Amino acid sequence: MMNKNLKDKDYLELLSKNYPTIDDASVEIINLKAISQLPKGTEYFLSDIHGESEGFEYLLGTSSGVIREKIELLFKNTLPEHDRVELQILIVDTKNLINQKSSEEDFNDWCRITIYRLIRICKVVTSKYTRSKIRKKMPSNFAYILDELLQTGDEENKENYYFSIIDSIIEISAEEKFIIALCHLIRQCSVDRLHIVGDIYDRGPHPDKVMESIMTFNEVDIAWGNHDIHWLGAAKGSLICVANAARLAIRYNNFDLLEYSYGINLRSLSSFANEVYKDDPCEVFKPNTLDKNMYDEVDKELAAKMHKAISIIQFKLECQLIKRHPNYGMDERILLDKIDYKNGTINIEGKVYELKDKNFPTINPENPFELTEGENTLIQSLAFSFINSPVLQRHMNYIYDKGGIYKIFNGNLLYHGCIPTKEDGTFDDVYIDGQYLSGW
């Protein structure tokens, strides 16, 4: 009994720091019980975004049909199909639709009606949240007005007050900004929590824009994917991660991402590649041009040379890493010493294959894993750019802050790929740097 009393005392002392009086504790109990009676907030799960910012923006904007569902619920019997579709487009792509409408003669009337309709939608999507939570999601510049409009009912004595606010917004030419704020709040409240289940980066052109969109949400968690982890490593200066991140970006022709968005200086890589592979067409290494670069258009032949140069550096660094860590059990991935450089073949598990590319001027057959002086200078220069990119560091710090190898939320285990576990479901031990580690 004494041990139980001591334990209770510890809990009470801990609680007293936040709730020093009985009244404080009572109010918090009432609040928590009331909140528990509200409907559960909408959770949105997205994975494998791979830099496709436009598709990601659309999915976020529509909330996978949640917004369309609310519009139909409110206006199916009172608005024609065209107007209902226009409302959805407005919420998803607010600025573009406003720009289209602003040149029309009845723009002010359209704004007045639209604000009224958006408020009705907003009342529905916010109905499952407390006022405190809604305020946190509101754009700060219109928070007071939005709060007033959302809390005003249909009572006759409040009707004039309600419409006078809307009239005042239009009279001072704040209607466009207010509609943008309303649409933003609707999008925010249509999804209570955003779960990103890995692979924000690589392949697509703008993971940077995806990150900026994610960072506008109040409630976010991120389970790191393999394509995110090497960017995390690159931002910390890991040479092998730098090589892999740069290689994949070049492979998919994402020069805008590297140079324009993140300020990664590729001049040393282009100069090195052009010199070392001057007479080599590097056909095997031609990048996949799925998307065009707007700001940093690189010649396809030069891009292929750059791709080959950084790939060879990565292969060497990978072999060095595996050699340093035999406990990884990845010796089968050491391939540079399996190549017959004279005949242009490779021996894998007793079978000889002809190589598609046989020109390796930077590889010493006697020591194939060693970087040349030029390669070492180049990868160090790239690492410096990754470490000193303010935008990249801001994005990676956010991923560190909001993420992990796995996340547990609402009883759900979220992870992107594979996590080593034992048969009973507990985390397996992995030997790293002289010790066995498990978990997170």
Over which residues does each language-model region extend?
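Feature recognizes metal-dependent phosphohydrolase scaffolds
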Residues: 1-440
